[in-house]
């Protein structure tokens, strides 16, 4: 049995979980998330969700822990939310946000304007003498990671000087320059 899949998920106060027609819906103070679940039996009793598989097929074994982790992430998201922070390292690199648009100046001849989904909130922090920071926040963990990866892809950090957009706390593999 899957080590992750066999452990139950507790439902905190203020969160409602519903399972109908193979779709689990989680509602909380930060929003609502849905996940389609196939081949795994979901049981909701006394604020505890358990996941059981009907057979020992390899695809069901693989999905057992996956669906448990996805539902747990959904509950965590509608309760506390998720945040990823990116740091813009480079001279003249700037980030500003106007509503649901993020404007990045990262060394190209033009600014990059990124339209964001309504579920995603972006905050830009610019202090004098420090690198600008972009914080991506949402109740959907997958969406936060996807938007943060897209922002990072506009100017991934290069290994020689370390310039580019990197996650806060990310360790870059640096290379030595050519020797004289």
Curated annotation (Swiss-Prot):
Gene Ontology terms describing biological process: cytoplasmic translation
Keyword rRNA-binding among UniProt keywords: yes
One GO cellular component term noted in the UniProt record for this chain: cytosolic large ribosomal subunit
Domain of life the protein comes from: Bacteria
Molecular function GO terms recorded: rRNA binding; structural constituent of ribosome
Classification via PANTHER family: 60S/50S RIBOSOMAL PROTEIN L6/L9, LARGE RIBOSOMAL SUBUNIT PROTEIN UL6M
Family recorded in the similarity comment: Belongs to the universal ribosomal protein uL6 family.
This protein's name: Large ribosomal subunit protein uL6
Organism: Christiangramia forsetii (strain DSM 17595 / CGMCC 1.15422 / KT0803) (Gramella forsetii)
């Amino acid at each position: 049995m899957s080590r992750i899949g066999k452990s139950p998920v507790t439902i905190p106060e203020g969160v409602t979980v519903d399972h109908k027609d193979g779709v689990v819906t989680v509602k909380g103070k930060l929003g609502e998330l849905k996940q389609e679940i196939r081949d795994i039996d979901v049981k909701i009793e006394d604020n505890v969700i358990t996941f059981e598989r009907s057979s020992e097929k390899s695809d069901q074994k693989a999905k057992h822990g996956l669906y448990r982790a996805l539902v747990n992430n959904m509950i965590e998201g509608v309760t506390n939310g998720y945040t990823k922070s990116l740091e813009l390292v480079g001279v003249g690199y700037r980030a500003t946000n106007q509503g649901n648009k993020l404007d990045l100046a990262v060394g190209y001849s033009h600014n990059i304007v990124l339209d964001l989904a309504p579920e995603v909130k972006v905050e830009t922090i610019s202090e004098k003498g420090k690198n600008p920071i972009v914080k991506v926040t949402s109740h959907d963990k997958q969406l936060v990671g996807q938007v943060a990866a897209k922002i990072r892809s506009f100017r991934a950090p290069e290994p020689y000087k370390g310039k580019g957009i990197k996650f806060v706390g990310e360790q870059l593999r640096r290379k030595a320059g050519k020797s004289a």
